[in-house]
A protein has these predicted regions:
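Active-site loop/lid in soluble adenylation, ligation, and acyl-transfer enzymes
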Residues: 2-115
């Protein structure tokens, strides 16, 4: 599948058109952001980790009967996906309160949000 022009770019990934209108290449970048995207730096391997984690989650959902957009992993940082209307949802997992959630919920920065587990 040939990757063509850039369709859209977010904080962590880019979507590219392909020769098939129903499919896109999702490219996970090594970009990291802080301060609501105002500070961008590169972290080598981040795109690979995010691509593999995304594929793990999507394959798990699919195994439980939840259809998803993932078609195949193309390489370390790219996957072939179906072109769909996005359902905007974000999940950030931390073991402590940080970032914009502290402002929204009035939480103390650094407050433990769950007990440690081994």
């Amino acid at each position: 599948m040939e990757k063509k022009e850039l369709l859209t770019k977010g904080k962590a990934k880019e979507l590219y058109k392909t020769d098939d209108e129903s499919k896109l290449v999702m490219d996970f970048t090594d970009d990291t952001s802080a301060f609501d995207g105002k500070k961008i730096e590169q972290l080598a391997g981040k795109g690979t980790v995010n691509n593999r984690f995304n594929n793990f989650i999507m394959n798990h959902l699919d195994s439980k009967g939840v259809s998803c957009h993932l078609l195949e992993e193309l390489n370390d940082h790219e996957s072939l996906v179906l072109s769909l209307d996005m359902f905007p949802i974000e999940c950030v997992v931390r073991n402590y309160a940080a970032g914009s959630i502290c402002k929204r919920l009035g939480l103390e920065i650094g407050r433990a949000s769950c007990r440690e587990r081994v």
